[in-house]
C-alpha cells in the first residue's frame, strides 16, 4: 500500500514522516536533514530554490527570498500590516484583498499567493520523500495550528492541492503531537500540549486512553512565535547600533537579513549557553569607513527583551483549562512541542502553569509530523483502533438583525458536527436574505472574522417574521465549514463551502497546480543542466590531469585533439545548452578513451620488456658446465627388469 505522507508545514521549518510496519519514521530530505527550512527563493536566472539552498543565499537576495509565509496564508492584506514590517520581501494586496508576495524572476515582476509559496515547500518535501522511498506520493495529512481559522485551513488545503497532493485530512498540530505521544499508551491520561513554534502558539487539553484521543479544549495565538523573539533581538541590535553610529539599518534589506540570521543563531545558542557573541563585520559603511557590530547578548538580557512575549502564552493556557472545566492539578502530563519550547524561560512558564515537569520522550521538532503520519495510517486502515475527536477552535456565527453575531456552533465543539437553526425575515415582503458567516468570540458581527457571504433568493412575499429560513452549519473532520440556507416554505435551498472571502476558486487552484507542475519540470531541467555541467567540468579536469601525467607517451596529433575537446567543453559549460554540454563531454570522453588505450598498450609493452627473463644457460653459443642427460619414456604398464 502506498504511503501517506505526514507533513508538519511549519513557519520556520517543515518536517515529514510516514508509518512503516506500524511504526512512524521521520524522513530525511535530499540534503540528509530531518527538517527543511520553510523558505523559497527566486534567483536572477529564474531558478527557484527551496529549503536550505534558499536559506544559504538569503543575505545576498533578501527581496526575492520568502520565509514565514505561514503568517500570511489565508489572511487579508489589512490584517498583516505589522508582519509586513518584519520581512524584507514585498507583500502586496492581491485578489479579494488577500495577501500576495511580489518578486523579480529573471527580470520580470511575478506575484505569488501564500498558497503557491507553501505549495513550493510541499513539492520539495513530496519530491524528497519519493526519492527516499522509491515510490510516487499522492496523499498527505497536513497539520495546521489549532487556532487557525477557516480561511487559513482552506488555504493550507489548497496549497497541498497545488503541490499535487490529495490532502486526506487537515489536522491540528497539538492533536497530532498527542497522537505521537499517546499511540502506545494504555492507561487513561489527561495531557496538555503546549505548542510554541516559529509563528504560532497553541495549547490543547486532551483525554487519551485505549486508542481514543479526545480534545477537550484548545486555545492559542496565531501571531506569536519564534519570529517574534528574533524580531525583539533584531530591534535591540538595530536600535543600539543607531544610538552608537546614528545609522538606521531598517532601510538596508541585506543588513537586516544578516541581523535576522544572527538574531536567530543567538536565540538558539542561548537555550544552552548563558551568553552569545554577536559578530557582524562590515554591516554597513558611511563617510568615515566600514561599520561593524560586535556585542554580547546574555540569556538574562534575552529574557528581559522578550518577557512580554513569553507572558502572552499564559492567558491562553488559563482559558483552555477553564474551557475544558479542569484545573492544572487534573493534568497528568505536559507535552512541549515546537523549537521555541527548548528555551529555559518557556519551559519554566509551562511548568508553572501546568504544575509538572515536561515529558521528555518526544522531539519537539518532529512530533507533529509523526502524528500526521499516524493519522494518515489511521485513515488508510494501516493503524487500527485509534479514534481522534478534535474540536473547532472558534465560535461560528451568523449576523442577525442589529449586527449581532448569533452563535451556531460554540468553540471547542467536537467535530465533525452539524447544527441547524430557524431564522426569519426582518422586513415585510423581503424577497431574499443575506447570510454572513462569522468566526470569533465577540458579540457584535463587525468585531469577528467574516468567513463568507451568500444569498437565498426567491422568498415569496410575506409579513416579517413569517418565512422560515433554516440555516445549517456543517463542519467536516478537517475543521472546514459548509453552510446551507433553506426556505422551508418553498424548499428553495442555497449551499456554499466556505472558502472565505479570502480563498482560491477551484479554477485558480487548477491553474496554479499546472503552473507548479511546469515549475517542477523546469526544476528538473535546471537540475539536469547543473549535473551535465558538473560532469563535463569533471571530465575536462580528469583529461587535463591525464595529459599532464602521461602526455609525453601520446602521439602529439592525438594529444592536440584532446586539448581541443577540453577547450570546447570549457566553452560550452559557460552556456545553458544541456544537449551541447553532453555532446562536448561525449566527444571528449571518446578521444580520452582512444589515447588511454594507446597509453595502456605503450605501458604494457614497456612493462613486458622490463620483466622478460634472462636467456637460459647454454643459450647463445656459450659453453656450459651442465651435462646433458638422456631420458627414456617408461611405459608404467610394462614390467621392469
Swiss-Prot record:
InterPro entries, alphabetized: ATPase_NBD (IPR043129), Chaperone_DnaK (IPR012725), Heat_shock_70_CS (IPR018181), HSP70_C_sf (IPR029048), HSP70_peptide-bd_sf (IPR029047), Hsp_70_fam (IPR013126)
GO molecular function, one term: ATP-dependent protein folding chaperone
Record flagged with keyword Transcription regulation: no
Modified residues (Phosphothreonine): 200
Composition-biased stretches (Low complexity): 602-611
Entry keyword set: ATP-binding, Chaperone, Nucleotide-binding, Phosphoprotein, Stress response
Upregulation: By stress conditions e.g. heat shock.
Family of the protein in this entry: Belongs to the heat shock protein 70 family.
Protein's name according to its UniProt entry: Chaperone protein DnaK
The organism of origin for this protein: Methylacidiphilum infernorum (isolate V4) (Methylokorus infernorum (strain V4))
Amino acid at each position: 500500500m502506498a504511503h501517506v505522507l505526514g507533513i508538519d508545514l511549519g513557519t520556520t521549518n517543515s518536517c515529514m514522516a510516514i508509518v512503516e510496519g506500524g511504526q512512524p519514521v521521520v524522513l530525511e530530505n535530499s540534503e540528509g536533514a530531518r527538517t527543511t527550512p520553510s523558505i523559497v527563493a527566486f534567483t536572477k536566472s529564474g531558478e527557484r530554490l527551496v529549503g536550505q539552498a534558499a536559506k544559504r543565499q538569503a543575505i545576498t537576495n533578501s527581496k526575492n527570498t520568502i520565509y514565514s509565509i505561514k503568517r500570511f496564508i489565508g489572511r487579508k492584506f489589512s490584517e498583516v500590516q505589522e508582519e509586513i514590517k518584519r520581512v524584507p520581501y514585498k507583500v502586496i494586496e492581491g485578489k479579494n484583498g488577500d495577501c500576495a508576495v511580489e518578486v523579480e524572476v529573471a527580470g520580470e515582476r511575478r506575484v505569488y499567493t501564500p498558497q503557491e509559496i507553501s505549495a513550493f515547500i510541499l513539492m520539495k518535501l513530496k519530491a524528497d520523500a519519493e526519492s527516499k522511498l522509491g515510490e510516487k506520493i499522492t496523499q498527505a495529512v497536513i497539520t495546521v495550528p489549532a487556532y487557525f481559522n477557516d480561511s487559513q485551513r482552506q488555504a493550507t488545503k489548497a496549497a497541498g492541492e497545488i503541490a499535487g497532493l490529495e490532502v486526506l485530512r487537515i489536522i491540528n498540530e497539538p492533536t497530532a503531537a498527542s497522537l505521537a505521544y499517546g499511540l502506545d499508551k494504555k492507561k487513561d491520561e489527561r495531557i496538555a500540549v503546549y505548542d510554541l513554534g516559529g509563528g504560532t502558539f497553541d495549547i490543547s487539553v486532551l483525554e487519551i486512553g485505549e486508542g481514543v484521543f479526545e480534545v477537550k479544549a484548545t486555545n492559542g495565538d496565531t501571531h506569536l512565535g519564534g519570529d517574534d523573539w528574533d524580531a525583539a533581538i533584531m530591534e535591540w541590535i538595530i536600535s543600539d547600533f543607531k544610538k552608537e553610529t546614528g545609522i538606521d539599518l531598517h532601510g538596508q534589506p541585506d543588513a537586516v537579513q544578516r541581523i535576522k540570521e544572527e538574531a536567530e543563531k543567538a536565540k538558539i545558542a542561548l537555550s544552552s549557553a548563558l551568553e552569545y557573541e554577536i559578530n557582524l563585520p562590515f554591516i554597513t559603511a558611511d563617510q568615515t569607513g566600514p561599520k561593524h557590530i560586535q556585542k554580547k547578548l546574555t540569556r538574562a538580557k534575552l529574557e528581559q527583551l522578550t518577557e512580554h512575549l513569553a507572558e502572552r502564552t499564559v492567558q491562553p493556557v488559563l482559558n483552555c483549562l477553564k474551557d475544558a472545566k479542569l484545573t492544572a492539578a487534573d493534568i497528568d502530563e505536559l507535552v512541549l512541542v515546537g523549537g521555541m519550547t527548548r528555551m529555559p524561560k518557556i519551559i519554566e512558564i509551562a511548568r508553572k502553569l501546568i504544575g509538572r515537569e515536561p515529558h521528555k520522550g518526544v522531539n519537539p521538532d518532529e512530533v507533529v509530523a509523526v502524528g500526521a503520519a499516524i493519522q494518515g495510517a489511521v485513515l488508510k486502515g494501516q493503524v487500527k483502533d485509534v479514534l481522534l475527536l478534535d474540536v473547532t477552535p472558534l465560535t461560528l456565527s451568523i449576523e442577525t438583525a442589529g449586527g449581532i453575531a448569533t452563535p451556531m456552533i460554540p468553540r471547542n465543539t467536537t467535530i465533525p458536527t452539524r447544527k441547524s437553526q430557524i431564522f426569519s425575515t426582518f422586513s415585510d415582503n423581503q424577497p431574499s436574505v443575506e447570510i454572513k458567516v462569522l468566526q470569533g468570540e465577540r458579540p457584535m458581527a463587525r468585531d469577528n472574522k467574516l468567513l463568507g457571504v451568500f444569498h437565498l433568493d426567491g422568498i415569496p412575499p410575506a409579513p416579517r417574521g413569517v418565512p422560515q429560513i433554516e440555516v445549517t452549519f456543517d463542519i467536516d473532520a478537517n475543521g472546514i465549514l459548509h453552510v446551507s440556507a433553506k426556505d422551508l416554505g418553498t424548499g428553495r435551498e442555497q449551499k456554499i463551502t466556505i472558502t472565505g472571502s479570502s480563498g482560491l476558486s477551484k479554477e485558480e487552484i487548477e491553474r496554479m497546480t499546472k503552473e507548479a507542475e511546469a515549475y517542477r519540470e523546469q526544476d528538473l531541467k535546471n537540475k539536469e543542466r547543473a549535473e551535465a555541467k558538473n560532469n563535463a567540468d569533471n571530465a575536462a579536469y580528469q583529461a587535463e590531469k591525464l595529459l599532464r601525467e602521461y602526455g609525453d607517451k601520446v602521439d602529439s596529433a592525438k594529444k592536440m585533439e584532446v586539448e581541443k575537446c577540453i577547450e570546447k567543453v570549457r566553452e560550452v559549460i559557460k552556456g545553458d545548452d544541456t544537449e551541447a554540454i553532453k555532446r562536448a563531454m561525449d566527444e571528449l570522453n571518446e578521444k580520452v578513451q582512444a589515447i588511454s588505450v594507446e597509453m595502456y598498450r605503450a605501458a604494457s609493452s614497456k612493462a613486458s620488456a622490463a620483466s622478460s627473463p634472462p636467456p637460459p644457460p647454454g643459450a647463445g653459443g656459450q659453453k656450459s658446465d651442465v651435462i646433458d642427460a638422456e631420458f627414456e619414456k617408461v611405459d608404467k604398464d610394462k614390467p621392469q627388469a
